[in-house]
């Protein structure tokens, strides 16, 4: 079987029984189960959710997204071998660690296959909850250009690129385009302040104002749990993005939970600690691939300038990247997953057929 066959590039065409349109995101696809199947699985599997909670099958792909575009490699390689399984394995590991440390639950109820989560429907908080321990990336670029206020936080003078910040910072941005919020531009992924959130907590989907402090607590605690665990395997947790939402438990009580993925090479920057101590930045995250793209194309501004999105989309559509760039990224994902979880990721020969087989045999979701 070829390398391209081992990659799950298309994940929105599985014959999973559903009566709603399949939601196809950049990397994951979501299949909302019928009311009948949701209630049957809750009863059969004993999930700790309300009896009428809507459930979904979330299938990750091996597609690689960067700068809001999907990229592909030579030889019809439409993804990164092992990427999907590595991301899910890392998130599963952190969610378990969060639970062991008494933090909040996640939306995941079951893991039928390395590419698949069964999740309960959550009401998302409309915030990209970003936590930063080092000044790098967009924060450093803004700081180097003279900006001293970031998401309403006053930054001190004398900070240096890639160095540890005086304290862990929360620098939130909008999740999607939010309309009608005073002082918040109607655009995706714009920086916001804590005051923006406090003054408009309902518009950001918080149930009550006190939940703002709760999400910040869960964000910092989750960051610290991951940071300490990564330090044990000589990795430095630089910054990350969390997402949160609300669900009801089996007793109907609403609770704030972690959503999406956490502490992965896609949602975080992770540096090799030994190299960092020598003055070198070695990325064990997707950031290394982003840097490759910036160096590979002559006009990096196309990738950084949101006004040039049509040119960027054409760049991704019309270019096959060198095979070694995607294979190098594959090694990054597989190696960091093994370091974090303590187990090697085994590449599937035919992931799509495996998913179909397990969802038919063990969950009765495929006719």
UniProtKB/Swiss-Prot annotation:
Catalysed reaction equations from the record: 5-amino-1-(5-phospho-D-ribosyl)imidazole-4-carboxylate + L-aspartate + ATP = (2S)-2-[5-amino-1-(5-phospho-beta-D-ribosyl)imidazole-4-carboxamido]succinate + ADP + phosphate + 2 H(+)
Enzyme Commission (EC) number: 6.3.2.6
Pathway(s) where this gene product acts: Purine metabolism; IMP biosynthesis via de novo pathway; 5-amino-1-(5-phospho-D-ribosyl)imidazole-4-carboxamide from 5-amino-1-(5-phospho-D-ribosyl)imidazole-4-carboxylate: step 1/2
One Pfam assignment: SAICAR_synt
Keyword Phosphoprotein belongs to the record: no
CDD domains assigned: SAICAR_synt_Sc (cd01414)
GO cellular component terms given for this protein: cytoplasm
Xref: InterPro entries: SAICAR_synt/ADE2_N, SAICAR_synthase_Vibrio-typ
GO MF annotation: an example: ATP binding
UniProt record similarity statement: Belongs to the SAICAR synthetase family.
Protein name (record): Phosphoribosylaminoimidazole-succinocarboxamide synthase
Encoding gene per record: purC
């Amino acid at each position: 079987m070829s390398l391209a066959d081992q990659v799950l590039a298309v994940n929105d065409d599985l014959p999973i029984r559903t009566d709603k349109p399949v939601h196809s995101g950049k990397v994951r696809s979501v299949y909302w189960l019928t009311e009948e199947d949701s209630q049957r699985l809750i009863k059969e599997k004993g999930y700790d959710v309300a009896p009428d909670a809507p459930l979904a099958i979330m299938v990750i792909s091996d597609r690689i997204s960067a700068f809001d575009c999907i990229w592909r490699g030579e030889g019809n390689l439409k993804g990164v071998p092992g990427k999907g399984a590595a991301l899910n394995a890392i998130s599963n590991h952190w969610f378990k660690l969060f639970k062991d440390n008494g933090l909040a639950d996640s939306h995941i109820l079951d893991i039928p296959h390395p590419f698949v989560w069964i999740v309960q429907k959550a009401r998302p908080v409309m915030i990209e909850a970003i936590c930063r321990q080092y000044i790098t990336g967009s924060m450093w670029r803004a700081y180097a250009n003279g900006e001293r206020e970031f998401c309403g936080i006053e930054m001190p003078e004398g900070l240096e690129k890639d160095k540890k910040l005086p304290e862990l910072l929360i620098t939130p941005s909008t999740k999607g385009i939010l309309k009608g919020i005073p002082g918040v531009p109607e655009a995706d992924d714009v920086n916001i302040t804590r005051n923006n959130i406090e003054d408009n907590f309902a518009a950001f989907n918080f149930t009550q104002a006190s939940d703002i402090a709760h999400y910040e607590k869960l964000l910092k605690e989750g960051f610290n749990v991951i940071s300490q665990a990564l330090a044990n395997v000589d990795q430095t947790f630089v910054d990350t993005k969390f997402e949160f939402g609300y669900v009801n438990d089996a007793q109907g009580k609403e609770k704030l939970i972690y959503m999406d993925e956490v502490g992965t090479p896609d949602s975080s920057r992770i540096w090799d600690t030994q190299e960092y101590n020598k003055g070198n930045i070695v990325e064990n995250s997707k950031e290394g691939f982003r840097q490759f793209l910036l160096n590979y194309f002559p006009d990096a501004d196309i990738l950084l300038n949101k006004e040039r999105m049509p040119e960027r989309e054409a760049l991704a559509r019309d270019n096959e990247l060198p095979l070694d760039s995607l294979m190098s990224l594959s090694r990054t994902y597989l190696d960091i997953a093994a370091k974090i979880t303590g187990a090697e990721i085994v590449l599937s020969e035919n992931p799509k057929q495996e998913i179909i087989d397990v969802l038919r045999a063990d969950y009765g979701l495929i006719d």
